[in-house]
């Protein structure tokens, strides 16, 4: 981090006296030529503003604080605006003998009135006049506004009398808040002072309670608009939860209840202890630094810390890579830790005010701090009570027995009570009492496990514990991932937030609330014997991120350590550790491998070993994926997961001593026999086609789908036919192609889909013994919706296009907008290719990973085909900006690719295709902002 610079004096940056002298000289030089006067004045002011901003930028980049920078920018703007006012009223519209009605005061209001300003923020100005508008005042205001606009300012402005200001502020809390921070810049001092004095007496006095309620409601609505979680990985620094506006809200309320005090004085009104005051100032300074850097980096009032800006801001703020921790992730963790601190401060302060509803006028901030009498209802647990419908506590019981810190949250959960603000504050301040001895206390472990595995709402309760700092103190392994982010587009939340949401998903599955989305998981949950192990594994599943030896092994070590400290029996410890180590296995096998291949299921079954572990892994995997972020879980993933679960369950039903592959083959044979019998009854003409299809095909589709496929194959005959339909439960359109098999068929179909502007999210490829191919594609449009869902004709055209492509006819390419790289360009993605001859008995599995883009599947398939290989199946998976495509391939003789030279050539060709796309992305990026390596952690 750059060393902090000593504060500078404003006159060293913008000399107000010199600035006014220059303006006066320009006015005299161009006397009689108003346009020349104006041009000269604007040039002088523009230079002063530019110099001030550049000095502020340079100082910020060399270690100046965020608050100091914001105050310096505000000071520079003050000098420019007030100098313009003086120039306007002295040299342009001078009132030689001003009347009482021509008095005018210029005041900064809103955030600018607070004396802090980001580089490209709006400025809010209030022109205060004593009576109705005069021609002189109107001319001054109009001249100034046009000049400010020409200087590049975005100006919010109003011209009002004092009475108008007071009337409007009574009616509108936004205006009231704006005037609360009003600050005179220049003009009539008496007029400005009268507004401030009357505002406090006639508006503020006696209205503290309603102002508090309005600000808290406004805060909640703002959070809902910006994203309810403060741990969204692209936070809004100004408006987001845990951002600057939350700190401003605290200051507004305190200032309203204690008028006229500075920020520093407000912080010492016995609201916070010394540590919290220090945290408040540090958070405010950090957030202001981030915001100013954002503005300077983009040249616009950018408030969102988006992926494409995060590496650049990390660099500007002096963060570097440290070990396995990239600079961008270190910076963002710092951001989220401060956001968490802001949340705690907000809860200590704002929730206290919300709880203490008063009808009489507050006489100061003391009306809202602890000590006011409220009726208490003692609980059967000593030291705990219910007060105002919330759970209260006698703070001394934490010192007497720190286990009471955990009991506080268990009681709140059991009784469905929110914490009284005093109780939350006391718990947060006492979290340091949780020592190694408390972590090993058996009673403490029981209380904690009651919350986690048997609680009414474990996600909410654990989130409160996390906010208070109690959870990370009691489970240090979890504490290490608090506020940790992964620099990729796959995850929408920080690691701790994702984890707590995943715990909540398991609780919802257990309660049956997700039966529609996850029927198999809901049906499976009652069969799980050890729910405690499941919840523990979910809480600890990502604790290995950033650890030595890889995420899975490091996580298993952390899980063992945590479970041993909790005093669990050895078998449960090993089960939790196994689940953590293997929590990605089921999704990998379901999404990247051919579930109809007996080797896939056999290998997976060997890893899982038992039906209980299979059930645990299913629920764990579903919850993990669903909690990653909106839209990550979809019906297609659910279908693949169900197929793998069902096939593996069939293996276990075959008995412990049975061969897994043989058991699966028996399962497929039985399913195929039943399907063929049903199909023969429904359509006798389809019997030859069904007999020629491989057994594995029948486990992938329902009887109705098999019948539809058979009729499509009959329609195709020796040529080709295709049909499409919307599969809303899969969030995709399904297009089925029946055609005579030939080399490059899959490549031609994939390229035709790309040409039509569709994206492939899944594909199934089957070839009958009679030489007819049946390829099923699941496709979406560019917005991630089922292709053709808004235009059924588009889906019909796609089906016809694929039929043409299958017949070898040329395909017209639909015009497609150039890909907007946007945020994805910030990620430097290292391509990877892996060839595996052990994953299948009959095929070589080729797995290629690189930047996701339209046409990637077709490009990879073309490269494989050019190598003389046939694609038997394709499996498409994606993790944000990264795609992972797996292909089952054979050579011209129908065998695995065993020749080392050919394997290396294929790998090189695929890497070249992936690397070319990555290089093109880097070149196409529109800015020179810093990039960072994308995290591959899941």
Curated annotation (Swiss-Prot):
Its EC number is 2.7.7.59, 3.1.4.-. Pfam families: ACT, GlnD_UR_UTase, HD. Residues 1-379 are annotated as: Uridylyltransferase. GO terms for biological process: regulation of nitrogen utilization. Keywords: Hydrolase, Magnesium, Multifunctional enzyme, Nucleotidyltransferase, Repeat, Transferase. Residues 734-813, 845-924 form the ACT domain. PROSITE patterns: ACT, HD. Uridylyltransferase (UTase) activity is inhibited by glutamine, while glutamine activates uridylyl-removing (UR) activity. It catalyses: [protein-PII]-L-tyrosine + UTP = [protein-PII]-uridylyl-L-tyrosine + diphosphate; [protein-PII]-uridylyl-L-tyrosine + H2O = [protein-PII]-L-tyrosine + UMP + H(+). GO terms for molecular function: [protein-PII] uridylyltransferase activity; phosphoric diester hydrolase activity. Gene3D superfamilies: 3.30.70.260, Beta Polymerase, domain 2 (3.30.460.10), cca-adding enzyme, domain 2 (1.10.3090.10), Nucleotidyltransferases domain 2 (1.20.120.330). Residues 495-617 form the HD domain. NCBIfam families: PRK05092.1 (NF003467), UTase_glnD (TIGR01693). PANTHER family: BIFUNCTIONAL URIDYLYLTRANSFERASE/URIDYLYL-REMOVING ENZYME, BIFUNCTIONAL URIDYLYLTRANSFERASE_URIDYLYL-REMOVING ENZYME. Modifies, by uridylylation and deuridylylation, the PII regulatory proteins (GlnB and homologs), in response to the nitrogen status of the cell that GlnD senses through the glutamine level. Under low glutamine levels, catalyzes the conversion of the PII proteins and UTP to PII-UMP and PPi, while under higher glutamine levels, GlnD hydrolyzes PII-UMP to PII and UMP (deuridylylation). Thus, controls uridylylation state and activity of the PII proteins, and plays an important role in the regulation of nitrogen assimilation and metabolism. Has four distinct domains: an N-terminal nucleotidyltransferase (NT) domain responsible for UTase activity, a central HD domain that encodes UR activity, and two C-terminal ACT domains that seem to have a role in glutamine sensing. Belongs to the GlnD family. This is Bifunctional uridylyltransferase/uridylyl-removing enzyme. It comes from Phenylobacterium zucineum (strain HLK1). The lineage of its organism: Bacteria, Pseudomonadati, Pseudomonadota, Alphaproteobacteria, Caulobacterales. The gene is glnD.
């Amino acid at each position: 981090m750059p060393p902090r610079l000593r504060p500078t004096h404003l006159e060293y940056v913008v000399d107000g006296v010199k600035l006014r002298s220059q303006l006066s000289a320009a006015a005299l030089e161009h006397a009689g030529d108003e346009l020349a006067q104006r041009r000269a004045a604007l040039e002088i002011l523009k230079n002063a503003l530019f110099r001030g901003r550049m000095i502020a930028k340079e100082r910020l980049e060399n270690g100046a604080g965020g608050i100091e920078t914001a105050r310096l920018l505000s000071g520079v703007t003050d000098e420019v605006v007030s100098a313009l006012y003086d120039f306007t009223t002295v040299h342009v519209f001078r009132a030689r003998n001003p009347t009482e009605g021509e008095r005018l005061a210029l005041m900064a209001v809103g955030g600018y009135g607070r004396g802090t300003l980001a580089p490209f923020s709006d400025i809010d100005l209030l022109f205060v006049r004593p009576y109705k508008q005069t021609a002189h005042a109107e001319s001054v205001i109009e001249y100034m506004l046009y000049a400010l606009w020409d200087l590049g300012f975005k100006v919010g402005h109003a011209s009002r009398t004092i009475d108008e200001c007071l009337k409007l502020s009574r009616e509108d809390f936004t205006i009231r808040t704006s005037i609360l921070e009003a600050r005179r810049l220049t003009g009539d001092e008496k007029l400005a002072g009268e507004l401030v004095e009357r505002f406090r007496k006639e508006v503020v006095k006696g209205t503290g309670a309603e102002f508090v309620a309005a600000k808290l409601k406004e805060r909640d609505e703002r959070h809902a608009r910006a994203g309810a979680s403060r741990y969204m990985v692209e936070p809004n620094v100004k408006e987001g939860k845990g951002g600057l506006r939350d700190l401003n809200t605290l200051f507004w309320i305190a200032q309203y209840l204690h008028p006229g005090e500075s920020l520093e004085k407000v912080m010492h009104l016995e609201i916070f202890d010394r540590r919290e005051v220090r945290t408040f100032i540090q958070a405010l300074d950090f957030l202001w630094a981030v915001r100013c850097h954002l503005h300077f980096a983009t040249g616009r009032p950018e408030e969102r810390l988006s992926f494409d800006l995060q590496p650049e801001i990390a660099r500007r703020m002096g963060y570097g890579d440290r070990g396995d921790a990239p600079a961008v992730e270190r910076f963002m963790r710092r951001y989220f830790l401060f956001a968490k601190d802001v949340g705690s401060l907000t809860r200590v302060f704002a929730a206290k005010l919300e709880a203490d509803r008063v009808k009489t006028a507050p006489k100061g901030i003391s009306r809202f701090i602890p000590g006011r009498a409220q009726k208490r209802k003692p609980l059967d647990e000593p030291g705990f009570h219910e007060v105002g419908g919330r759970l209260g506590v006698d703070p001394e019981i934490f010192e007497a027995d720190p286990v009471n810190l955990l009991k506080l949250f268990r009681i709140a959960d059991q009784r469905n009570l929110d914490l009284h603000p005093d109780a939350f504050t006391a718990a947060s301040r006492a979290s340091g009492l949780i020592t190694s001895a408390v972590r090993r206390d058996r009673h403490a472990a029981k209380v904690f496990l009651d919350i986690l595995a048997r609680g009414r709402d474990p996600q909410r309760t654990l989130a409160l514990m996390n906010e208070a700092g109690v959870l990370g103190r009691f489970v240090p392994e979890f504490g290490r991932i608090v506020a940790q982010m992964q620099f990729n587009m796959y995850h929408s939340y920080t690691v701790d937030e994702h984890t707590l949401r995943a715990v909540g998903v398991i609780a919802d599955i257990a309660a049956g609330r997700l039966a529609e989305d996850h029927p198999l998981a809901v049906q499976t949950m009652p069969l799980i014997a050890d729910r405690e192990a499941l919840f523990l594994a979910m809480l600890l599943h990502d604790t290995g991120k950033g650890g030595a030896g890889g995420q899975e092994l490091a996580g298993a070590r952390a899980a063992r350590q945590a479970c041993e400290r909790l005093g669990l029996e050895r078998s449960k410890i090993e089960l939790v550790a196994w689940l953590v180590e293997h929590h990605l296995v089921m999704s990998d096998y379901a999404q990247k491998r051919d579930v109809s291949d007996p080797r896939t299921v056999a290998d997976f079954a060997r890893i899982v070993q038992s039906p209980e572990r299979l059930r645990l892994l299913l629920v764990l995997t579903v919850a993990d994926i669903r909690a990653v972020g909106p839209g990550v879980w979809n019906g297609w993933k659910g279908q693949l997961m169900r197929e793998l679960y069902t096939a593996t369950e069939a293996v276990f039903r075959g008995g412990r001593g049975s061969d897994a592959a043989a058991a699966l083959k028996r399962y497929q044979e039985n399913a195929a026999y039943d399907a063929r019998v049903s199909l023969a009854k429904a359509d006798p003409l389809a019997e030859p086609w069904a007999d020629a299809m491989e057994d594995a095909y029948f486990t992938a589709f329902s009887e109705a789908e098999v019948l539809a496929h058979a009729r499509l194959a009959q329609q195709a005959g020796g040529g080709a036919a295709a049909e499409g339909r919307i599969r809303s439960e899969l969030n995709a359109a399904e297009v089925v192609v029946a055609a005579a098999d030939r080399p490059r068929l899959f490549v031609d179909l994939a390229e035709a889909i790309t040409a039509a502007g569709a994206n492939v999210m899944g594909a199934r490829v089957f070839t009958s013994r009679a030489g007819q191919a049946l390829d099923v594609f699941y496709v979406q449009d560019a917005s991630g919706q089922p292709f053709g869902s808004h235009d059924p004709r588009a889906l019909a055209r796609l089906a016809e296009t694929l039929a043409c492509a299958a017949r070898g006819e040329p395909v017209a390419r639909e015009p497609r907008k150039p890909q907007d790289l946007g945020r994805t360009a910030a990620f430097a993605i290292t391509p990877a290719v892996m060839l595996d001859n052990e994953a299948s008995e009959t095929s070589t599995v080729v797995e290629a990973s690189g930047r996701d883009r339209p046409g990637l599947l077709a490009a990879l398939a073309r490269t494989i085909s050019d190598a003389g290989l046939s694609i038997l199946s394709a499996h498409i998976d994606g993790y944000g900006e990264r795609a992972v495509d797996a292909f089952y391939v054979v050579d011209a003789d129908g065998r695995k690719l065993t020749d080392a030279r050919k394997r290396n050539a294929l790998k090189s060709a695929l890497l070249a295709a992936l690397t070319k796309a990555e290089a093109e992305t880097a070149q196409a990026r529109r800015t020179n902002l810093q990039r960072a390596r994308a995290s591959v952690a899941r």
